[in-house]
Amino acid sequence: MKTLLLTLVVVTIICLDLGYTEMCNMCVRPYPFMSSCCPEGQDRCYKSYWVNENRKQEAYHGKYPVILERGCVTACTGPGSGSIYNLYTCCPTNRCGSSSTSG
């Protein structure tokens, strides 16, 4: 009985923590995606794209933009920040950037 009670308490604590922890998909080419909790203070997810000199996203075989990296950041400086060949965009959702989400 004590073991069952202890198990319920541990599961409750874990579930409560998951509700307040930002999860971002982490990826550096090549695959796979890896979801990870963001460090404290880094509560925004971002995606990094390869762009050409006109700041347009480069497509992979004309199908979709090449995402170079995903991760956590403290704050977003706005859409389209980054260097001339690397475009960073923040995601509006938790665990953004997977193949099943558009953000």
UniProtKB/Swiss-Prot annotation:
Keywords: Disulfide bond, Secreted, Signal. It is found in: Secreted. Disulfide bonds join C24-C45, C27-C37, C38-C72, C76-C90, C91-C96. Residues 1-21 form the signal peptide. It comes from the Eukaryota. GO terms for molecular function: toxin activity. Gene3D superfamilies: CD59. InterPro entries: Snake_3FTx (IPR003571), Snake_toxin-like_sf (IPR045860). Expressed by the venom gland. Its main location: secreted. One of its GO terms (cellular component) is extracellular region. Negative results: does not bind to muscarinic acetylcholine receptors M1 and M2 (CHRM1/CHRM2). Is unable to compete with alpha-bungarotoxin for binding to nAchR at concentrations up to 100 uM. Is not toxic to mice at doses up to 3 mg/kg. Belongs to the three-finger toxin family. Ancestral subfamily. Orphan group XVII sub-subfamily. This is Cytotoxin-like protein TA-BMBGT3. It comes from Bungarus multicinctus. The lineage of its organism: Eukaryota, Metazoa, Chordata, Craniata, Vertebrata.
